Amino acid sequence: MDKIFVEEAVSELHTLQDMIRWTVSRFNAANLFYGHGTDNAWDEAVQLILPTLYLPIDVPPHVLNSRLTGSERLRIVERVIKRINERTPIAYLTNKAWFCGLEFYVDERVLVPRSPIGELIEAQFQPWLIDEPVRIMDLCTGSGCIAIACAHAFPDAEVDAIDISTDALQVAEQNIQDHGMEQQVFPIRSDLFRDLPKEKYDLIVSNPPYVDQEDMNSLPKEFKHEPELGLAAGTDGLKLVRRILANAAGYLTDNGILICEVGNSMVHMMNQYDHIPFTWLEFENGGHGVFMLTRQQLVDCASDFALYID
């Protein structure tokens, strides 16, 4: 960003509204990619600036006329510069992200929460769940956002939050503590199902790595800040999904279901396994590539994934 823009911003912008407007203009001029919780420059600016000032996202309109100190303007401008020059997602600049209306701590050890599964959680997985879940597994938990959101949606359920990454589990543990969920959400290190005891769950939810090699090679620069372990999944993006499909039935109750996100790799799933009765879920708020299978359906297609049993 040109030095003149920085000097003008610090010296001439006075109110919160001024700073938001300036940031939106700079973001539009920089042609940024939006895909980490927002889809436009205005929301991106708001979610950068308000947390930087230790303010809630939903401030009353009259607060927008508040004057900013010189140090506050400088701190905002520094983060705007990082967002533009380094293409750093704003969640990593503020260490804040939102999922299912809940706030989470995030840093570059975990992906920024953005899964459409949040819409399913808010609807309590209806009409797919037959019974109120007693035990839930969040497989590949990352920041723990899905596990914690499930715990809020089902306050009587125990939730196991599984991840292979000790770094990710440290972030998940922090979020579990921040939400006061230590007695309901339990972080566990495991390579998918490999290191888990054979216990039964009414619901397994998974947002595993699913980006195929072609997409990995063409991701916008913003995604380079995220851990590759949480994104890349082989040539067709199904490296981990096949293992999940091979093993999930052994961990589900009779009426249990698997909800799994595969994003753009949905195309590979449909081409390679067109005989499997995936229920591809639809979303009102955007998103795609999430399927549901019952335990019995997983049992019926077990032979397709026999090579991937842990």
From Swiss-Prot:
One of its GO terms (molecular function) is protein-glutamine N-methyltransferase activity. InterPro entries: DNA_methylase_N6_adenine_CS, HemK-like, RF_methyltr_PrmC, Ribosome_uL3_MTase, SAM-dependent_MTases_sf, Small_mtfrase_dom. It catalyses: L-glutaminyl-[ribosomal protein uL3] + S-adenosyl-L-methionine = N(5)-methyl-L-glutaminyl-[ribosomal protein uL3] + S-adenosyl-L-homocysteine + H(+). Signal peptide: none annotated. Keywords: Methyltransferase, S-adenosyl-L-methionine, Transferase. The keyword Methyltransferase applies. It comes from the Bacteria. Pfam families: MTS (PF05175). GO terms for biological process: methylation. This is Ribosomal protein uL3 glutamine methyltransferase. It comes from Vibrio anguillarum (strain ATCC 68554 / 775) (Listonella anguillarum).
